[in-house]
């Protein structure tokens, strides 16, 4: 959500800086993503009036104007804006003025005509990125006044994250309430002038789904001037909140939505048949005619707003339809309703209509301000574009409206959960500042939440609120007291941070993704597994619980490759949810650690003439380095394995002795193509519980005798893995003589038959007691050669 800091300060103005305000919001649970000025500083721009406007004699669609800027002399200014005309108030950058982009205005001659400044657009002043035409100000804008001060541009735009449970904060007044509570201040009361009906026109309301729409207010407003310009102060506040101006009616409705957090539906009164509004279920095969004359086939049991013949809109959404207002509208119907949040959330997902209205309704709006919001819109419309209001039509079923319930808060439970003591008076004060009705006696608070706090239903919610407003940074640092005695012999558990640090040292970056993942991506990676499906997902992109960490890693790679990132090394640790009937709650929750690599092996460098993409052996090396920390790398085996998500020729299961602990490989080319991955992607995933224990290393004597090595080159069938060859050799001699074996070369091609390959393994010899003789070394080499030829049907080269 974006909002103007100055708009907030109209409601509550704490004596703190903008940065301190942003920090307060973040610490209160509303993370501030961005704090930026409305525009960069500029000077020398004043309000002027065009008193003369003539066509340039030498240029087409260019005007020569005389502008009154409040001085004795009129300015001659050349302008090519399409809306340049006589008798409008404009923003004039005079000679010597400095614009936000650093340009300084100088006297210019354009095709023989001098220009003593420029007439500014919003984009020239850095207020918007793109505009057509010069700024037009109200006719009562004071000539000669500093434009920066007139438009109150010493303002900041604050963008914050609102969690799904805090629908009450999707408005300026909602955020202001929080700031008031944090700073021990009182919020200004909402003052809406009462609307006296001047006409008697009403429209009957029929609510046929009272459980979904228990409250509905309506009003007819006649003879409005919809072509009236939107007041600059409204248009500016909307713009600073990221909403473009449309027309006076839509702008005022959006303004009240941002201000109070309550949507208002508007319909053209002349397009209503039968002089009735019905809130009902859609009928089978029913069609909603959209504004572009296309048709939307309604699904059965969709809640719609209709007249006696046809549906006008899907309830709780902005549906651009044929019955909305247009430039010829004179009479309108204003509607302010309460809809059950879960129903609107479901409908907006079904129809893929995620707009401002559904966003608010799905999170819950305060039913106690429905009439207030309607009066606020009516008042602003009458003031800005005229009109004659009718009486309010009220259809409210109080028994169906959500009601706050009393919650009991116990002193003992509060202290136990938060771990420190807050004074009784401070707790009561915090709750009252948040709008809760509070009674305290015998270490128990009896609390009634306000109507706008749908998220408060249990004692733990209250404890979280008290801690949040008290301030997480005010929680005292107290050492944990425990009677446990640490057994120092249990030093064989590796901290997860050790693994993370190793991966970071190898160039990886840690990411954190949601446990809720995209069903389609997960289905591609694990087609044979059935995940846990969420009944009420946040979005359709987060509808299942993850079976592995690969879904989140791959989605992150896709996001970054679309932003021109050529090399990615990412890892994540987290819980995966594997359905299993005999497990607790029928699901296993396994802690996994996974990584992904994509793109180039190395960053671009002038000394690297050859561009090398990352391959299987790069990520295998990372996994081996990770597993080496466990001191069990000698027990690790990479066995060929066909995983549905991985390339059959470049994948393996990772075994610790005889237990599978994870998988590694390249993403299958088919999946790579379906997900639009532009370069080959390699992944690994390991079970943390399987690798978190390590074997304490043994202290061994360092040999003072020389080391020797010998090579064995053997031709074997392609299906033989080098690891199998090395294992067979290790069985022949003990570690006192044959200390290590490495694969030094793999060759196919000339002089090697088709279907075969040549391995060269290097055997390292060293004794701790004496210098090995040639006979001892040759004896081991010969034994290895014989067993390899016999075991793998090989031929020595």
Curated annotation (Swiss-Prot):
Keyword Magnesium: yes
UniProt: Mg(2+) binding residues: 455, 465
Cofactor dependency: Mg(2+)
Gene3D superfamilies in alphabetical order: 3.30.56.10, Bira Bifunctional Protein, Domain 2, Ferrodoxin-fold anticodon-binding domain, Nucleic acid-binding proteins, Phenylalanyl-trna Synthetase, Chain B, domain 3
One Gene Ontology cellular component: phenylalanine-tRNA ligase complex
Cited PROSITE patterns: B5, FDX_ACB, TRBD
Family: Belongs to the phenylalanyl-tRNA synthetase beta subunit family. Type 1 subfamily.
Keyword annotations from UniProtKB, A to Z: Aminoacyl-tRNA synthetase, ATP-binding, Cytoplasm, Ligase, Magnesium, Metal-binding, Nucleotide-binding, Protein biosynthesis, RNA-binding, tRNA-binding
Entry EC number(s): 6.1.1.20
Sequence ranges assigned to domain tRNA-binding in this UniProt record: 39-148
Organism listed in the record: Blochmanniella pennsylvanica (strain BPEN)
Protein name in the entry: Phenylalanine--tRNA ligase beta subunit
Chemical reaction(s) catalysed: tRNA(Phe) + L-phenylalanine + ATP = L-phenylalanyl-tRNA(Phe) + AMP + diphosphate + H(+)
Compartment list: Cytoplasm
Domain of life from the UniProt record: Bacteria
Record's cofactor remark: Binds 2 magnesium ions per tetramer.
Summary of subunit composition and partner proteins: Tetramer of two alpha and two beta subunits.
């Amino acid at each position: 959500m974006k909002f103007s800091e100055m708009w907030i300060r109209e409601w509550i103005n704490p004596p703190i800086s903008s940065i301190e305000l942003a920090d307060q919001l973040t610490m209160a649970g509303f993370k501030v993503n961005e704090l930026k000025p409305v525009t960069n500083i500029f000077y020398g721009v004043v309000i002027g009036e065009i008193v003369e406007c003539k066509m340039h004699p030498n240029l087409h669609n260019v005007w020569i104007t005389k502008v009154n800027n409040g001085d004795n002399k009129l300015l001659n200014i050349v302008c090519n804006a399409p809306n340049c005309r006589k008798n409008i108030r404009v923003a004039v950058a005079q000679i010597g003025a400095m614009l936000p982009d650093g340009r300084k205005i100088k006297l210019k001659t354009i095709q023989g005509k001098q220009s003593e400044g420029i007439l500014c657009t919003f984009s020239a002043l850095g207020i918007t990125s793109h505009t057509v035409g010069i700024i037009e100000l109200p006719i009562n804008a004071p000539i000669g006044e500093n434009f920066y001060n007139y438009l109150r541009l010493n303002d900041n735009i604050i963008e914050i994250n609102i969690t799904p449970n805090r629908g009450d904060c999707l408005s300026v007044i909602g955020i202001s309430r929080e700031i008031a509570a944090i700073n021990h201040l009182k919020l200004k009361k909402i003052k809406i002038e009462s609307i006296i009906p001047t006409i008697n026109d009403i429209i009957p309301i029929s609510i046929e789904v009272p459980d979904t729409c228990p409250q509905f207010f309506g009003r007819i407003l006649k003879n409005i001037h919809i072509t009236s310009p939107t007041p600059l102060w409204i248009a500016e506040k909307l713009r600073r909140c990221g909403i473009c101006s449309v027309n006076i009616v839509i702008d005022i409705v959006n303004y009240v939505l941002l201000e109070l957090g309550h949507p208002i539906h508007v319909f053209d009164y002349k397009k209503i048949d039968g002089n009735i509004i019905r809130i009902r279920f859609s009928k089978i095969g029913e069609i909603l005619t959209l504004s572009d004359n296309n048709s939307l086939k309604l699904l059965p049991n969709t809640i719609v707003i209709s007249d006696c013949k046809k549906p006008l809109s899907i309830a709780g959404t902005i549906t651009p339809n044929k019955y909305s207002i247009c430039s010829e509208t004179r009479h309108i119907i204003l509607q302010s309703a309460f809809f059950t949040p879960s129903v609107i959330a479901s409908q907006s997902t079904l129809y893929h209509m995620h707009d401002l209205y559904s966003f608010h309704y799905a999170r819950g709006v305060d039913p106690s301000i429905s009439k207030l919001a309607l009066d606020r819109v009516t008042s602003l419309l009458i003031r800005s574009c005229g009109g004659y209001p009718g009486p309010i039509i009220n259809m409210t079923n109080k028994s169906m409206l959500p009601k706050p319930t009393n919650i009991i808060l116990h002193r003992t439970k509060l202290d136990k959960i938060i771990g420190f003591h807050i004074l009784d008076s401070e707790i009561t004060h915090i709750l009252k500042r948040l709008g809760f009705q509070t009674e305290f006696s015998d270490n128990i608070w009896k609390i009634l939440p306000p109507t706008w706090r749908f998220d408060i239903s249990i004692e733990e919610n209250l404890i979280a609120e008290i801690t949040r407003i008290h301030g997480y940074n005010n929680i005292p640092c107290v050492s944990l007291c425990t009677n446990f005695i640490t057994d120092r012999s249990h030093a064989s558990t590796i901290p997860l941070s050790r693994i993370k640090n190793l991966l970071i040292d190898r160039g990886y970056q840690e990411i954190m993704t949601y446990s809720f993942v995209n069903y389609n991506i997960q289905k591609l990676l694990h087609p044979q597994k059935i995940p846990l499906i969420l009944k009420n997902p946040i979005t359709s992109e987060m509808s299942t619980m993850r079976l592995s960490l690969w879904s989140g890693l791959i989605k992150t790679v896709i996001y970054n490759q679309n932003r021109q990132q050529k090399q990615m090394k990412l890892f994540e640790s987290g819980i995966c949810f594997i359905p299993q009937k005999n497990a607790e709650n029928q699901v296993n929750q396994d802690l996994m650690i996974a990584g992904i690599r994509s793109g180039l092996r190395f960053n671009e460098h002038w000394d690297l003439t050859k561009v090398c993409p990352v391959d299987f052996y790069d990520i295998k090396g990372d996994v081996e380095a990770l597993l080496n920390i466990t001191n069990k790398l000698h027990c690790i085996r990479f066995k060929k394995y066909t995983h549905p998500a991985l390339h059959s020729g470049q994948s393996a299961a990772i075994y610790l002795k005889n237990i599978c602990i994870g998988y590694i490989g390249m993403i299958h080319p088919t999946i790579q193509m379906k997900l639009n991955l532009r370069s080959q992607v390699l992944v690994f995933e390991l079970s943390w519980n399987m690798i978190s224990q390590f074997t304490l290393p043994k202290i061994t004597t360092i040999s003072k005798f020389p080391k020797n090595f010998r090579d064995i080159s053997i031709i074997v069938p392609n299906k033989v893995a080098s690891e199998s060859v090395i294992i067979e050799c290790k069985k022949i001699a003990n570690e006192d003589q044959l200390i290590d074996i490495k694969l030094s070369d793999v060759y196919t091609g000339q002089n090697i038959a088709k279907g075969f390959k040549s391995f060269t393994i290097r055997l390292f010899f060293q004794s701790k007691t004496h210098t090995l003789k040639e006979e001892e070394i040759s004896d081991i080499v010969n034994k290895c050669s014989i067993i390899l030829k016999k075991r793998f049907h090989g031929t020595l080269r």
